[in-house]
Amino acid sequence: FQSSLKAQSFYDIGTIQEIKIVFSQSNWDYMLDTAKSGGEGYVMAQTVAINGTIFDSVGVKYKGNSTYNANQSKNPWHIELDTYKTQDYQGFKDIKLSNVAKDPSFLREVLSYEVARKYMVAPKSNYAVVFVNGTQIGLYSNSEAISKTFVKQHLFSNKETFIKCNPPAGAGPGTSDYPNLVYEGTDSADYYAGYELKSDHGWHDLIAFTDTLKNHITAIEELLNVDQTLWMHAFNNGLVNLDSYSGGFAQNY
C-alpha cells in the first residue's frame, strides 16, 4: 500500500494519502488547543510519516476558524515539515488538511478545486487519512497550500510581492479590518490590520493596486488579469464559495 502511494503524486486524485503523526507529549491535544488560542504557534511532533516516509521534528498546529472547535476530536491541521529543519515531501513543505466540516458528502472542497482548475490556477486536492499516536482521527481533504512553492510553480517566481489577504487578528462579526482592496491612502500602516505581508517588500505595490482600482480603473489591466478575475468571481458565486473575496469578510485569497 505505502510503496504504491510513494509512486503517486501527493495530490493525485485517485489515491488516499496516509499521514501518521506521533507526539511525545501525552497532552498533545491540549497543547494544540492552547497554541491555537494564543496565536497559532506550532507544536513539535516527534515524527510525521507520510505514506511511510518518516520526518522527525515537525511543526504541527490546528487551523481554521468556524471549522475548529476545542471540544471536537477531528480538527483541521496545518503540518509544516520545515519548521525546525530543512525537509520536504515531493517538494511540498506545507500540508493543509481540512476536516470536511458541515459537508456530509465529503466532496465539496475536492470537487470544487477540480472545477476551478479548468478555468484558472488553483490548488490540487485529494484526501488523506490521519492517525495520531496510532489512533485513526478520520478522513480529511488534502489541498495544496498557496505557498511560495505554489507561486513559483505557476507564476515562475517567488521573489515578487506576496500578500496573504487575511486579517492577522482574524475576521468575523464585530471586526471591520477586511482585505477588501479598498484604497486606504498612501500610508502603509493603514493596511496592516487587513493584510499579512509574506514577502520582504510589497506594501507599496498593494497601495498602488488599490489606488488604480479606485482612481485609475482604465489602467487596471496593467496590474490585474481581468479575465482570470472574472472566472474567479463566477466560480465563487456559482459554487457559493463565500469564505473568499466574494464573501462578507472578503478574505482567504
Language model features: what each stretch is:
Residues 45-51, 55, 107-121:
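Zn2+-dependent metallopeptidase catalytic core
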